[in-house]
Amino acid sequence: MVRIDDSQPVTKCWLSPTELDQLERAAGKDGWEREVAIQLMGRCGLRASEVAGPSDADLRYSDDGDIWLFAVRGKNTKGGGKQTRDAWMPDAVADDLHKYSRERNLDRTDPWVTASTDTVRRWVKEAAHTIATQQDAPRWEAVSSHDLRRSWATQHLVERQVDVRTMMSIGGWSDYSAIEPYLAAPTEARIGEAMRNNTSQSNSV
């Protein structure tokens, strides 16, 4: 079930990886470009305003890191003009985008997504509405494009325990105070894992 915080004027939502899969599939039924847009936000942590722009020319494999990185020009959380960062792309998303570019006959500099920011946001709302209707799950109606980045940050910082400096770099945050509002409480699975590990370490002393 989608986790929500409706204690503030703007409801915040956090999707699990499985729920993100559902959203991608729902969006993909209305067009491959929609699915790609959601992958870039939910799997790579892009803001809705950053989705249109990146292309094959921006994607590179880092031999040092053994990972895919791609250049994103986006918000500067310190203020001022936009800045470029290297965002991380999971292998599965890179594979999908290579296939997408081939089948769409995209040139290296052709953006994967050409839709406006408002259109990208609408795609998320439409896919979430489809799931809410099909599953009789009203919480999905509150899901927005920003919640995909929120879910991405929580999944890696809270659930996977990725270090903050790494997340600041690939997510485009200038300091931890800019990330903290994105985070949700750990899931029960994460709490259980943490407490079991702590208990095991205590017993071994």
Task: For every predicted segment, state its role.
Residues L40-P54, E159-V162:
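A short, glycine-centered helix-capping/turn motif at helix boundaries
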Residues G171-R196:
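Catalytic-site neighborhood detector that most strongly recognizes the C-terminal catalytic loop/helix
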Residues K29-D30, K125-S169, Y176, E188:
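Short, basic (Lys/Arg/His-rich) helix/loop patches that form interaction surfaces
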Residues M1-Q22, G79-D91, L106-D107:
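DNA breakage-rejoining catalytic core of tyrosine-based enzymes
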Residues G53-D96:
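Conserved tyrosine-mediated DNA breakage-rejoining catalytic core shared by Y-recombinases
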Residues R25, G53-P54, Y61, P181-A184:
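Phosphate-coordinating loops and pocket residues in cytosolic domains that bind phosphorylated ligands
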Residues P90-W140:
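Active-site/catalytic core of tyrosine-dependent DNA strand-transfer enzymes
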